[in-house]
Swiss-Prot record:
SUPFAM superfamilies registered for this protein in UniProt: Metalloproteases ('zincins'), catalytic domain (SSF55486)
Recorded GO CC terms: cytoplasm; plasma membrane
Organism in which the protein naturally occurs: Lactococcus lactis subsp. cremoris (strain SK11)
UniProt entry keywords in alphabetical sequence: Cytoplasm, Hydrolase, Metal-binding, Metalloprotease, Plasmid, Protease, Zinc
Segments passing through the bilayer: none
Record text on subunit structure and interactions: Monomer.
Protein name: Neutral endopeptidase
Lineage summary: Bacteria, Bacillati, Bacillota, Bacilli, Lactobacillales
Length: 627
């Protein structure tokens, strides 16, 4: 029998950990996943009902339902031939030479399913957040991240072997000749990319990935392709700069993307087209297409046809479904109460910043200014992005609709470049069980789906709600002041607003946070403190501020507060999935999230009478306080 004083996570969640079962089609179960399962069930019923009673007064939802019905028409899917896929494959197969590839870059971006072996993106400019910038990065890797390619990684060989076999089977389904050779060649190109790819640790420090280069310099360094013409075709103008997010890839560009490697690049593109098409046809192909992902995370079985139908519809109509969900399931009373909690949390933060002992008054005042400028969005957005009015289902096949949608979405990506950034837009649908802070707009967003038990309920006590959604709200506020967010000002621009000595003190705090988690063992391996530092700063800030707010309520119950905190992090997962998270997830493993932050809070020791001999004890001089 565990005790809270030795293991908060295991004690509070003992019954759940014993009884909870990981669904056969998922790699884990958690408080978040339980809500996802509930939402899936509700939405599947809702969309089935709407299929019988079409929402003709809501054109975007109507198109979503038409697509949903097409995704669920298994008779048509079983009969559908592969001519459209073969047509996509032919767009690459007919590129006989590297010269052919060079001459068709624009066509490939806008009118094919073939990904280029490099990527341009349109994102808010980190130093001018009201305008968009053109970003440049590599094409990504086949395995989850760079660490999987180390020869000592226990799963490297089996994953690459499985991917090759699975991919060649998919290629053969589409009558591609030399399928095994193509899969092997794709892996050879993938292996060439590894040294130049960003590590997960590098991606985690996103504020440090902003490397602007004048467009003239950017294009002149690349000799093998005419990127100047491509950029003009993409954004219909010549930007003054390109933001390079993967430096090593840019430096290695000509040694990777060249005539000598063309056969490997071509094979890589063919595998991407083939794998991407598997979701749109018969059941056997759908199962085959998901096999590698299931093997990677040790998932026992494929998603059911009904869940797949919903997944596919969400992949194109996420905000449409989210807005429907938010309006149906999220009430005004809940919205008002959560808004009250957000306001309370911001006030707590203001008070804590004004009393902060390690910041100068000047930096603390600027931090409070940034805090005051944070805009919260709760529940669901007021309107849909305009792009959804362009997605129209046709009389063609499911795959043909997807091709058309992809073309429209790609065109929209680059069309945005000449517009101002809409800082009120949501980057997460309302039915997603999550929340986020956006540094470029200085906004915090709480979708309707997370605003339910165990995170939040009007039936829960104030302490339970502060231990649940309160810590999530304060966590997102804390991201404005984590190692990345702290580098952005109140307008959302990457801008040094700290005094040097204050930022140096903050960097020391970051090092302490890294040390607090680094190497801590879990059942799947040790935690990487550098990878998870930003989320750990947010977790610590979140629980600290929410605790302060909970204590201001008349019905305060700190046992309930800490217990609820432990409940929201409950999780069980396959070992393979946990190992993948350890290598690439910016969040700490669930048990560490539940157990480590409370040990930095005096109230935890007082509430549960934690002694020096207890496993949860941390000496006062080692208790870390940041915000």
């Amino acid at each position: 029998m565990t005790r809270i004083q030795d293991d908060l996570f295991a004690t509070v969640n003992a019954e759940w950990l014993e009884n909870a079962e990981i669904p056969a089609d998922k790699p884990r179960i958690s408080a978040f996943d339980e809500l996802v399962l509930k939402n899936e069930k509700n939405l599947a019923k809702d969309l089935a009902d709407l299929s019988q009673n079409l929402p003709t007064d809501n054109p975007e939802l109507l198109e979503a339902i038409k697509f949903y019905n097409k995704a669920g028409d298994w008779q048509a899917r079983e009969k559908a031939d592969f001519s459209a896929v073969k047509n996509e494959l032919a767009k690459v197969e007919t590129l006989n030479t590297f010269e052919d590839f060079k001459n068709n870059l624009t066509q490939l971006v806008f009118h094919s399913q073939a990904p280029l072996p490099f990527s341009f993106s349109v994102e808010p400019d980190m130093k001018d957040a009201i305008h968009y910038s053109l970003g440049f990065s590599g094409p990504g890797l086949i395995l989850p991240d760079t660490t999987y390619y180390n020869d000592e990684h226990p799963r490297k060989k089996e994953l690459l072997d499985f991917w090759a076999k699975n991919t060649s089977e998919i290629l053969k389904t589409f009558d591609v000749e030399n399928a095994e050779e193509i899969a092997k060649s794709a892996l050879k190109f993938d292996a060439l990319l590894v040294p130049s790819a960003n590590t997960s640790e590098e991606w985690a420090k996103y504020a440090e990935l902003y490397h602007p280069i004048s467009t003239d310099s950017f294009v002149s360094k690349v000799k093998n392709l005419d990127l100047k013409s491509l950029i003009k075709d993409l954004v219909k103008t010549e930007p003054d700069k390109v933001i390079v997010y993967e430096d090593r890839f840019y430096e290695s560009f000509d040694s990777l993307i060249n005539e000598e490697n063309w056969s490997l690049i071509k094979a890589w593109m063919l595998t991407k087209i083939a794998r991407g098409a598997t979701s749109f046809f018969n059941e056997d192909l759908r199962i085959l297409g998901g096999a590698y992902g299931r093997f990677l995370s040790n998932v026992q079985e494929a998603r059911s046809q009904e869940k797949h139908q919903l997944d596919l519809t969400e992949s194109y109509f996420s905000q449409v479904i989210g807005l429907f969900y938010g309006k149906k399931y999220f009430g005004e009373a809940g919205k008002a109460d959560v808004k009250r909690m957000v306001t309370a949390m911001i006030k707590v933060y203001q008070a804590r910043l004004s009393k902060n002992e390690w910041l100068s008054q000047e930096t603390a005042e600027k931090a409070i200014e940034k805090l005051d400028a944070i805009t919260p969005f709760i529940g669901f957005p007021d309107k849909l992005p305009e792009i959804y009015s362009r997605l129209k289902t046709t009389s063609g096949s499911l795959y043909e609709d997807a091709l058309k949608f992809d073309e429209i979405l790609t065109a929209r990506t680059f069309e945005k470049f000449s517009e101002d950034v809409d800082k009120t837009s949501w980057h997460m649908p309302a039915h997603m069980v999550n929340a986020y802070y956006s540094p470029d707009s200085n906004t915090i967003v709480f979708p309707a789906a997370i605003l339910q038990a165990p995170f939040y309920s009007l039936e829960q006590s104030s302490s339970q709600n502060y231990g649940g959604i309160g810590t999530v709200i304060a966590h997102e506020i804390s991201h404005a002041f984590d190692n990345n967010g702290a580098q952005f000002d109140k307008e959302g621009n990457l801008n040094k607003w700290w005094l040097d000595e204050d930022y140096e003190a903050f960097e020391e705090k970051q090092k302490e946070m890294i040390a607090l988690f680094d190497g801590v063992e879990t059942e799947a391996g040790p935690a990487n403190g550098k990878l998870i530092v930003s989320e750990n700063i947010a977790d610590q800030g979140g629980i600290t501020a929410a605790l302060t707010a909970a204590k201001d309520e008349k019905d305060v119950d700190l046992k309930a507060f800490f217990s609820q905190w432990a409940k929201i992090w409950r999780m069980k997962a396959s070992k393979e999935f946990q190992q993948m998270l350890l290598s690439m997830d910016f969040h700490a493993p669930a048990k560490l999230r539940a157990n480590i932050p409370p040990t930095n809070l005096e109230e935890f020791y007082d509430t549960f009478d934690v002694k020096e001999t207890d496993k949860m004890y941390r000496a006062p001089e080692n208790r870390l306080k940041i915000w």
